[in-house]
Amino acid sequence: GKNDYEFLPNGSYQWTAKKYESKLQNLSKVLGSLSRDLVPEGPAFIGVAEAENSRVLEDLVKQPAISNYEFVHYEGPDRRGIDCALLYDPKQFSVTHSKLVLSTPFEGDTVHLTRGFLIVDGQLAGERVCVIVNHWPSRGAKSPVRVHAARQVKALKDSLMRSDKKLKLIVMGDMNDDPM
């Protein structure tokens, strides 16, 4: 099982139904207001780096501010129950294929597996667009662990681009590092 007990009422964060509902409302208000000044419909998709499970995502997209969104999520290997997901507006972006590509262990470490790479392929404004949602290891891990994740994303990108040279590819998420 997943080690996410700290988010229960008796856990260290003392989550209650009231706290949960408040979090959903606040998150949905922020997400619902993103880019509205530039794109009245809002973003076509939003990458999520720390989703606990599909139930939480279902509850989130039921909120009035983002009820037009659907989501893609796969249960990943992270022992804390933290996964990547993609929220998307089906009127703007139609999903044609999705999968979770598991990360390979860094130097054989199978205990501290990262969340994997969520790949979502679809159509946006008549063009094929592929999104890779990431959540790389934290800064508590050594830099080579994040470099290892970056190399895996590059290999995924190279493979996708070999099959379609005109592919529009977006890599997003929490890379737990500063831009270079």
Residue ranges and their predicted role:
Residues 1, 12, 97-99, 128-138:
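Active-site-proximal beta-strand elements of phosphoester/diester hydrolases
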Residues 124-155, 163:
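Metal-dependent phosphoester/phosphodiester hydrolase catalytic core
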Residues 149-180:
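Metal-dependent phosphoesterases centered on the DNase I-like endonuclease/exonuclease/phosphatase
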Residues 25-31, 111-121, 151-158:
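A Trp-anchored, charged/polar loop motif used as the substrate-binding/catalytic surface
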Residues 49, 134, 173-174:
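Active-site flanking residues adjacent to catalytic metal/cofactor-binding acidic residues
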Residues 45-128:
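Structured beta-strand-rich core segments of catalytic domains in phosphoester-bond hydrolases
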Residues 1-82, 150-151:
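N-terminal, active-site-proximal structural segment of metallo-dependent hydrolase catalytic domains
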Residues 53-55, 79-81, 139-140, 176-180:
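Active-site environment of divalent metal-dependent phosphoester hydrolases
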